[in-house]
Curated annotation (Swiss-Prot):
It comes from Legionella pneumophila (strain Corby). The lineage of its organism: Bacteria, Pseudomonadati, Pseudomonadota, Gammaproteobacteria, Legionellales. The record marks 148 as: Important for catalytic activity for the proton relay mechanism but does not participate directly in the coordination of zinc atom. It comes from the Bacteria. This is L-threonine 3-dehydrogenase. GO terms for cellular component: cytoplasm. The gene is tdh. Catalyzes the NAD(+)-dependent oxidation of L-threonine to 2-amino-3-ketobutyrate.
């Protein structure tokens, strides 16, 4: 089958023919229809320090997908051939304390599809049935292809109560933009998003934010004053991994504020702990999606009218994957979809 493979320990992705994956008695085989390129895939494509330390070569990459079930393992229940599906890309062990307690997103033995095991940038994907999400008919193929990153956004945006609250989002990548749409949809008052990328800030404006702020030219304190905010932000969602953005958020938070951290800053990032301690900030790390409450909530939000379509900016046939990766890496895009 056709597959996009990290075939060499150097920058790039290569299209190769690989065997159709075998599937076990508790797995399903999925015919891939659409995939989306993630920031993780760009790290692998660029072959940065994280990728070099993490990715076995060769490896079929990718973990964001929509497809249809074509084969079902003999022990699988509740799924059938022909169903429209997406899937959870974190494969958990099922035996650790957190898995047994129903907190699979905290499994210490998690394996990533397209990172530690063959991914979805291929004509077929084998996936444990417990990770497969059957889709309602009113979820489109494009929406289904980006449910994984939408789930990151939902996990972060739903970490704290945002109804009537003022929310600051640092980082206007696709996940940050979708988080902005979520908190607006569920009742936040002011939603401010920051970045230095004007293209992505414009996408955020299309998603209904109160202010999309280029911090190269405008101060957060000035924006807060314009909005009539006298006490700072109630909830912060840090999506960028940028040390300056992280510390700007801490300064902008109200006393007793809540901060969810999804972006991964460099290990040596200094933090002004005085802001955290004397303001009594509550900080929560966010990784992946809650299994499977986040999936339920995000599909329900789409069904209730949440529109995330503006974040999808490019569609390419899979044979144009090199151009698609270059566009995604440029930062001048939202989500980029490959059609198989």
């Amino acid at each position: 089958m056709k597959s996009l493979v990290k075939a060499k320990k150097e920058p790039g992705i290569w299209m190769q023919d690989v065997p159709v994956p075998e599937y076990g008695v508790n797995d399903v085989l999925i015919k891939i229809k659409r995939t989306a390129i993630c920031g993780t895939d760009i790290h692998i494509y660029s072959w940065d320090e994280w990728a070099q330390a993490t990715i076995p070569v060769p490896m079929t990459v990718g973990h964001e997908f929509y497809g249809e079930i074509v084969e079902v393992g003999k022990e699988v229940q509740g799924l059938k051939v022909g169903q429209r599906v997406s899937g959870e890309g974190h494969i958990t062990c099922g035996f650790c304390r957190n898995c047994r307690a129903g907190k699979r997103h905290l499994c210490r033995n998690t394996l990533g599809v397209g990172v530690n095991r063959p991914g979805c940038f291929a004509e077929y994907l084998a996936l444990p049935a417990t990770n497969v999400i059957a889709l309602p008919d009113n979820i489109t193929e494009e929406q289904a292809a980006i449910l994984d990153p939408f789930g990151n956004a939902a996990h972060c945006a739903l970490a704290f109560d945002v109804v009537g609250e003022d929310v600051l989002i640092t980082g206007a990548g696709p996940i940050g933009i979708m988080a902005a749409a979520i908190v607006r949809h569920i009742g936040a008052r002011h939603v401010v998003i920051t970045d230095v990328n004007d293209h992505r800030l414009e996408l955020a404006r299309q998603m209904g934010v109160s202010r999309a702020v280029n911090v190269k030219y405008q101060k957060l304190s000035d924006v807060a004053n314009e909005l009539g905010m006298l006490e700072g932000f109630d909830v912060g969602l840090e999506m960028s991994g940028n040390p300056m953005a992280l510390n700007d958020m801490m300064k902008a938070m109200n006393h007793g504020g809540h901060v969810a951290l999804l972006g991964i800053p460099p290990q040596e990032t200094p933090i002004d702990w005085n802001q955290v301690i004397f303001k009594g900030l509550v900080i929560k790390g966010i990784y992946g999606r809650e299994m499977f409450e986040t999936w339920y909530k995000m599909i329900a939000m789409l069904q209730s009218g949440l529109n995330i379509s503006p974040v999808i900016t490019h569609n390419f046939p899979v044979d144009e994957y090199q151009h698609a990766f270059q566009i995604m890496a440029s930062g001048q895009s939202g989500k980029v979809i490959l059609n198989w």
